[in-house]
Structure formats: C-alpha cells, structure tokens
Amino acid sequence: DRDPGEALLFLGRMSPDKGAHRAIRIARQVGRPLNIAAKCREPGEIAYFEEHVEPHLDDQIVYVGEVDHDAKCRLLAEAHALVVPIEWEEPFGLVMIEALACGTPVIAMRRGSVPEILDHGRTAFVADDLSGMAAAVARVAELDPAELRETADARFSVDQMVNGYIAAYEAMIDG
C-alpha cells in the first residue's frame, strides 16, 4: 500500500546519463528531501558519485545505496514522486513502469522512450527541462494512484507484453 511522504526518489544507476546530480538540484529547488537508491559498483559509477553526488549528501539528500526488490518497493510506496532526470535516449525505462505499478507519480525528462511510456498529465509529468520537472513536483497530487496502477497493468503486465510479442511474431511470419 502506498503511504507517500515528503521525499522524492531517484532510482537507477550512478551515471551522468541517469542524472542523480540533476535530481539533487530539483530536490533543492523545491525544498524536498531526496532518497537516492542507485547501483554504484563500476569505476565510472564510483567516480561520478564521488564528484557529483557525495559532496551534496546531508540529512535531506540521502544515498541509500543499491537496493533489493523489497526495499525498492518500500521506497516507491513512500516516495512523494519518482524523478527521472535522464540526459540520454533511454530505450525503455523499467523503473518508470515499476513506479506506476506502485501508484507512485513519475516526473521525467522528455527523452528517449519517456513520452511513449508516460502520459503527461494523466499518469505522470513529462518535462523539457529541470525547471519543468521542479514545477511538476507541486502537481503530483493531481495524479490518481489507482489510475497509475491500472495503466501499468493494462499496458505493461506480463500478459500484455506476451500478447504483444505474439502479435509481432505473427506479423513477421505472415510477412
């Protein structure tokens, strides 16, 4: 069950493309705490963390480390919103779908697959820049958690994905 708090959530991998440093800027701009849950094992990830994230950690900006499934679900349930400030053409952002499945609002940068996965103003807020993402934080109460879950189930459930693959294979076979 969803019990949102005040904190925003960044969930991903420690890299400039994923943008934990941008999530920090958003959290600071709107005056909200931020939990950062991210994989940070590779040399590049560690270097990025040490240079761009670690200097900003305090009682409001917290790095919780890499998390397992149960911890991820708990963080999503407790988050005010998931922020996805990507700076690359993300081919498929599973974390956005996981958030929707939990009924957690998503605020994402309009890059890659984001506009295909998220429906701006209905299931999420999609922005063109960090200012737009920050402005969307105040609007997440407009999104209905039940509708977010229903959308995730209707579009991305295992049955839906399997049926989509079958249809694609049948179309290829039929030429």
What residue spans do the PLM features occupy?
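Conserved donor-binding/catalytic core segment of Leloir-type glycosyltransferases
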Residues: D1-A37
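Acidic donor-binding loop of glycosyltransferase active sites
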Residues: L8, A77-P91, T104
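Nucleotide-activated donor-binding/catalytic signature segment of Leloir-type glycosyltransferases, i.e.
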Residues: I36-A38, E50-C73
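Short glycine/serine-rich donor-binding loops of glycosyltransferases
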Residues: G93-M96, V114
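Short hydrophobic beta-strand element within catalytic cores of glycosyltransferases
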Residues: A101, P105-A108
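Short acidic/histidine- and often glycine-rich active-site loop of Leloir-type glycosyltransferases
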Residues: R110-G121, F125-A127
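C-terminal "capping" alpha-helix adjacent to the active site of nucleotide-linked donor transferases
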Residues: F125-E147
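A short, well-ordered alpha-helix in the C-terminal region of glycosyltransferases
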Residues: R139-V158, G164
